[in-house]
Amino acid sequence: MKVFTIGFTQKNARKFFSLLRDNNVKTVVDIRLNNTSQLAAFAKGEDLKFFLTEFCNIDYIHDTTFAPTEVLLKDYKNKKVSWLDYEKEFNRIMERRNIRSYISKNYANEDSICLLCSEALPNQCHRRLVAEIFKKTLNEVQIIHL
């Protein structure tokens, strides 16, 4: 299984959709807590779903099971917690949600998915953490950051 990750900031629509299409992504899994971002018009939930399905033949799922809690996200954005503390707390949240079992049940039969969040780079984004959990959970997972 290929687990791609992508952030939509610092990408225009052409680059964003071309990366997904050119890498044969089958399903975009939007793991944002809120998918109505004002950062890029093409990345709003219903619009994004329309563009992906109609123009790229890519399925779209908004799955907040992989999202941080509102409190953790707010604390990180307001610099009340460091990235290291965010990462630790996020992983604890995933454990409490039995995320590995959830992945096995809901995503084990996928060929290729792309985890979507807003951050331009994966280094300090929860999509990287989720991709790593996929790799620990399923056999032969290849992580590719777009």
Segments the model singles out, each with a brief description of its role:
Residues 1-146:
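Residues lining hydrophobic/aromatic ligand-binding pockets adjacent to catalytic sites
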